[in-house]
């Protein structure tokens, strides 16, 4: 099992940053390995990604979501992965975004790559591209302010 924790400061208000992060279908615009994300309902996503030259598809469940605080998920099938994204208000115009993620490595090369920091570099790069994406726009492309607890929409 490999784990990654990376953070970045985004020069936008917390609600703008959070709202943009909830636009999961926009992820391919800043996540290098992600080819497509389809939101099938309020708590389920279908992912397609290419990692290390290998194509992966899986379904994930949003297990927890609280506006301007956290989005957590877990894979329902395919290669195991889970994690959460935390949003912390620094001041009126800046937000700290932290990604915490765990995933199962497959084979010696993935395990070695993980151990050598390739996962951290990937997440750090994706966060940097997210920062550029939202800061250059100055506004979110949309937003979902609902709440999820234990995989169920509660609000």
Question: Could you describe each region identified by the protein language model?
Answer:
Residues 1-44, 129-138, 151-155:
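Hydrophobic ligand-binding cavity/cleft-lining segments
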Residues 3-7, 44, 57, 70, ...:
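Intrinsic-disorder/low-complexity, polar/charged segments enriched in Ser/Thr/Lys/Arg/Asp/Glu/Gln
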Residues 32-34, 60, 85:
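Small-residue-enriched segments and motifs
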């Amino acid at each position: 099992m490999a784990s990654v924790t990376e953070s970045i400061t985004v020069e936008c208000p917390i609600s703008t940053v959070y709202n943009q992060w909830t636009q999961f279908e926009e992820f391919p615009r800043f996540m290098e390995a992600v080819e497509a994300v389809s939101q099938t309902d309020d708590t389920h996503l279908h992912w397609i990604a290419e990692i290390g030259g290998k194509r992966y598809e899986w379904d994930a469940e949003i297990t927890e979501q609280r506006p301007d605080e956290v989005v957590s998920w877990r894979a329902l099938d395919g290669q195991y992965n889970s994690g959460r994204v935390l949003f912390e208000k620094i001041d009126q115009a800046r937000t700290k975004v932290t990604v915490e993620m765990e995933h199962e490595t497959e084979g010696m090369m993935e395990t070695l790559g993980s151990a050598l920091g390739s996962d951290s570099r990937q997440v750090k790069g994706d966060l940097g591209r997210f920062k550029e994406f939202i800061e250059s726009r100055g506004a979110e492309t949309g937003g979902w302010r609902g709440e999820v607890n234990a995989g169920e929409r509660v609000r």
